[in-house]
Amino acid sequence: KQLIDSYYESKTVRADIEDRTEEADKVSARIAEILSEKTFTFSPIEYITIHRRLFQGIYKFAGKIRDYNITKKEWVLKGETVLYASADSIRETLDYDFMQEKNFSYKDLNINDAITHIAKFISGVWQIHAFGEGNTRTTAVFTIKYLRTFGFDISNEAFAYHSWYFRNALVRANYNNLSKGIYATTEYIEAFFRNLILSEHNELKNRMILVQESSTKNVQSASASNETCLLYTSPSPRD
């Protein structure tokens, strides 16, 4: 019985890994296709469409705004969660954030202030977490397309190589716990964007943004396996 149970448990694990690998391969190809297209519209519809195109046939809810509230235990927060948008307010919040950004003028900003503003906007859109899964990958693709409209020659390599840091930086930009002296900060996502846009060499290490050492179990891990590319080769975590 133990051998049989062990066999089927192993088979289940293998099947899950194969499914996740298949998902990553499919999403990777779709990302490349979307980024190769010289098209873009700055709107919530574009953002939602990117999600649909990335995950159609993978998630039943591809391109659909979630209708339930969510929490996600985060390794970088010692198992705590970011407060995501309520399901009832997602579309209105998306519309508001996009309208605010559309009406914002970068004309008189120096590049440093522009990067800070972009970091805040992208962090805000991600915090809404419009979908059940796939929010970070959707946000990454949208960000690349958006930054290209400013004339920046943005590739997907940095997002691929630092995919886990990118997500953790977005988490830190949206988490406050004043009782523990933790404040939301965009400094980490700004460091990522400065490397991306200005070719700086800021060190992007997950341990640098960990709120404190954690032994909490069942939270998203920052192990080497999670450092692999969310956009291309690693579908876990599925955001």
Feature names for model-found ranges:
Residues 232-239:
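Conserved small/polar residues in nucleotide/adenosyl-binding loops
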Residues 40-44, 48:
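N-terminal, positively charged, Ser/Thr/Ala/Gly-biased leader segments
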Residues 1-38, 76-228:
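Phosphate/pyrophosphate-binding active-site loops
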Residues 48-98:
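A glycine-rich, hydrophobic loop/mini-helix early in the fold
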